[in-house]
Swiss-Prot record:
Species in which this protein is naturally found: Thiobacillus denitrificans (strain ATCC 25259 / T1)
Keyword DNA repair attributed: no
Record-linked InterPro entries: Pantoate_hydroxy_MeTrfase, Pyrv/PenolPyrv_kinase-like_dom, Pyrv_kinase-like_dom_sf
Protein name: 3-methyl-2-oxobutanoate hydroxymethyltransferase
Chief localisation class: cytoplasm
Length: 262
């Protein structure tokens, strides 16, 4: 049966973890789909891992649509979320709708955008017009220059309270999922408890409703991996076995371990 947003919400209610991986093409989509990954995130991380840029900022909407079509072509079961790239949604809700509609037409089941309270009106605008929205708080890669680098967010009391408030506001506006990136595990646990929608963590501890990794990090393609990642290909023997090990580790709660959290 195809995974839907209702499926993901039901998994959260049952306490079953949601396994998410980034995906950029049809071949990996087929492997990930068959291995039981619940959600495929067509991430603007492709700017770094596919295109070789130093950040996600150069990625264009046309490129996101292209990779979304590729992933959709290889997927029969998993739920597909596609990132709105930098500059495609920030100017206005109307601009966001035009960009989101393009990704939905390419095969996405939901779009993802970054930002807190400033994005509430945009989330409400999209949700009211039938476009499912995944929010994204904590480290915001599209704001890396403003944030001063890839640093853990929410460590200060005021920042933590604001993140919780933003998460609640985004859910009230109509967001159906939310990614929490590089925030302290205790804060992610608090946010998860405050929301009805599933939280998907990356570097956010084990108490989120699900976990996401950049697939290339999970497969150990780089000599240096983020603290929150793990090489599941080491000793697995094949990409398929590695992905199945990742899904199993997320589902049974053994990943992420304390060593992967902040």
């Amino acid at each position: 049966m195809p995974v839907t947003l209702s499926t993901l919400k039901a998994l959260r209610q049952k306490g079953e973890k949601i396994a998410v991986l980034t995906c950029y093409d049809a071949s990996f989509a087929r492997v990930f789909d068959a291995a039981g990954v619940d959600v495929l995130l067509v991430g603007d991380s492709l700017g770094m891992v596919i295109q070789g840029h130093a950040s996600t900022l150069p990625v264009k909407l046309a490129e996101m649509a292209y990779h979304t079509r590729c992933v959709a072509a290889g997927t029969t079961r998993a739920f597909i979320v596609a990132d709105l790239p930098f500059g495609s949604y920030q100017p206005s809700p109307e601009r966001a709708y035009t960009a989101a509609a393009r990704l939905m037409a390419a095969g996405a089941h939901m779009i993802k955008l970054e930002g807190g309270a400033v994005m509430v009106d945009t989330v409400a605008f999209l949700a009211a017009r039938g476009i499912p929205v995944c929010a994204h708080l904590g480290l915001l890669p599209q704001s890396v220059n403003q944030l001063g680098g890839y640093r853990v967010q929410g460590r200060e009391d005021g920042d933590a309270a604001q993140l919780v408030a933003d998460a609640r506001a985004l859910e009230a506006a109509g967001a159906g999922l939310i990614v929490l990136e590089m925030v302290p595990a205790a804060l992610a646990k608090t946010v998860t408890a405050a929301l009805s929608m599933p939280t998907i963590g990356i570097g956010a501890g084990a108490d989120c409703a699900g976990q996401v990794l950049v697939s290339y990090d999970m497969l150990g393609l780089y000599p240096r991996a983020p603290k929150f990642s793990k090489n599941f290909l080491a000793g697995a023997g094949s990409v398929d076995a590695a992905v199945r090990a990742y899904v199993a580790a997320v589902k049974d709660g053994s990943f992420p371990a304390a060593e992967h959290a902040f």
